[in-house]
Amino acid sequence: MKKFLILILIIFCSCDKSITLIHDSNKLDSIVDKYIDNGSQALLLVRLEDNDGNSIYQYSNKNNTLVPDHEINEKTWFRIWSMSKIVTISLTMDLVEDGILKLDDPVAKYIPEFVNLKVAVSKTGKPLSSYAGGLGVDVLEDDEPCPYQLVENKSKMTVLQLINHEAGFYYSTTGIKCLDNILDSKNLAASKNSNELIQKLSELPLIDYPGNKHFYGLNTTVLGLVNERASGETLN
């Protein structure tokens, strides 16, 4: 199924009120329309505000082919997607300030189910992050990522590594079919609760040794689970 990115663009103007005028709003409209018409975006809402929060420009549009049944205006609700990472990290820092957890705490302190996490490597022993994104950097013909092997994780995974996306988690968009398929097979989004999600994650290999490399993925999702375990409260 084709995935459509729904983008909200909110720009805050820092100009003086006396000069916050949009002289040719049609030009701005045409920029929005370009991305709607070519199918790059399903919905777009653009809003410009002055220092006092007064709207000086607002325009929205949608692709009727992609989202025929959706309406869009200033009251439309949007998923914030990865912007939720900022919220999760902010909650973590609150817990650090309150002395509830430390950035160098091992993740296994709060999620002991992760004690036996394995790392996926190729038959030559290279972590699969070396092959991610289809880069194939310095990969020989007889050195392919699939099928991968599992090796012991001898690195300590820390809370800070989750924040920095250095803990070894990933999304099913690595371009490594055997790794993407096993993650998709877990259907993480269908987890009924945090404990079930943790159990599924504990059955997946890491793409690299914690602390070895930055790799964007489910790290902040795991951070949210750490927050819950450490505080005794749910993110909801």
State each model region's role:
Residues 94-101, 227-236:
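Bacterial peptidoglycan biogenesis and beta-lactam-recognition machinery
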Residues 63-215:
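Active-site-proximal loop and beta-strand segments within enzyme catalytic domains
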